[in-house]
Amino acid sequence: GADDSDWRKKGAVNVIXKDQGQ
């Protein structure tokens, strides 16, 4: 989503959250 670059910076934990739509 639009936050892809942001979650990539934060790390793998946020990748999981992103996959859940967070």
Curated annotation (Swiss-Prot):
Domain of life: Eukaryota
Single GO MF descriptor: cysteine-type peptidase activity
Keywords noted in UniProt: Hydrolase, Protease, Thiol protease
Enzyme class: hydrolase
EC number: 3.4.22.-
Positions of the UniProt region annotated as Disordered: 1-22
UniProt-listed GO biological process terms: proteolysis
Family (UniProt): Belongs to the peptidase C1 family.
Protein name: Cysteine proteinase
